[in-house]
């Protein structure tokens, strides 16, 4: 897989924008060819019954927590994200999602283990790019991401959302980190013993997730058995909906 190095001037520009605005866009974080490879893999995984969890919260989406390929990207792209943000990071978890026609992502903030989040486009079948929107610098901004392009943002601080999807499918992976010298270091590996595929029935976390989705959250209310909108792959009642 081709992961291009970021030269010093570009890295400095990205880090400055990230410091100032809370987000930056990294074109071709992986090559378009590598993105297409993973998109094909993700689509083929639909043939494995139970591999993805339906996500009614997004109207038309399926997702997988800690998919092995996504976890690989989480590790392999850590240094790239560190250069682009100017921060030393710890990996938390990844999430692979396939959106279908009519899918929508309500405006929301993420939980602490998504302190430094990335959204990486892998592939799609649609008439046009489907922007990921953020509120930064006092304005709403639509960020188009082609295959291989990555948005890096402060997930718990930068509101983000997507308008209804009009294409057939859109494959996206999300890579989440925390600052190595920050206040959320306990969220390393998202409470797991290691990075890699996670079976919630046989494996345990060393903490229980917080019940808040973030400050000023505007995410619509979800039912207790619906997938948690944070992208964990767990039911809402077992994740952000857990009673304190």
Question: Where do the model's predicted regions map?
Answer:
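Short, Lys/Arg- and Gly-enriched loop/turn segments at beta-strand edges
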Residues: 159-166
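Catalytic core of non-heme Fe(II) oxygenases with the double-stranded beta-helix
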Residues: 101-157, 169-172, 178-194
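A structural connector/turn signal
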Residues: 13, 138-140, 217, 225
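Short, cationic low-complexity segments
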Residues: 139-142, 193-214
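Conserved double-stranded beta-helix
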Residues: 57-58, 63, 73-132
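Acidic/negatively charged segments and metal-coordination signatures
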Residues: 203-244
